[in-house]
Amino acid sequence: VINTAYALTYTLGTASGITNGTPASRLVVSEGGEYVVNFSAQISSTSSSTVSFWFWPRVNGSDVAGSTMINALHRNGATLVVSRSAILNLTAGDYLEAMWAVDSTSGFLDASAATAFAPAAPATTISITRLHG
């Protein structure tokens, strides 16, 4: 559904001290502290019109103020990788969600299949590293 916020789900490769919550979109930290969060998404469009995408972090069900990343694709078949890093202060038991929305059914997150010369690529990635407590 267009113009609707969705949480991305990550179920593999969680680091020590970070686990999946319920639902699986929740990434729960076991220790409080300052965390650097690195996010990337490969976005694509099948429209010749402009398609806009929004991405932002949500902590404990609340959107992080001033954190939205907005990107637009302007042609049919366009693909772009977008990324951002943020530092968040989290308390033990807090959960982080990566949220996204798009304004057209022609826009989508694009996981690329492997080719004869390159490996597959996920549609999105996230890494969460505790800097200090």
Segments predicted by a language model, with ranges:
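Terminal (often C-terminal
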Residues: 1-50, 63, 67-70, 105-133
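Glycine-rich strand-loop-strand elements at beta-sheet edges
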Residues: 63-91
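Compositionally biased, intrinsically disordered linkers/stalks adjacent to structured regions
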Residues: 88-116
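Beta-strand signatures of extracellular beta-sandwich domains
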Residues: 54-58, 97
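Extracellular beta-strand-rich recognition modules
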Residues: 33-43, 81-85, 93-101
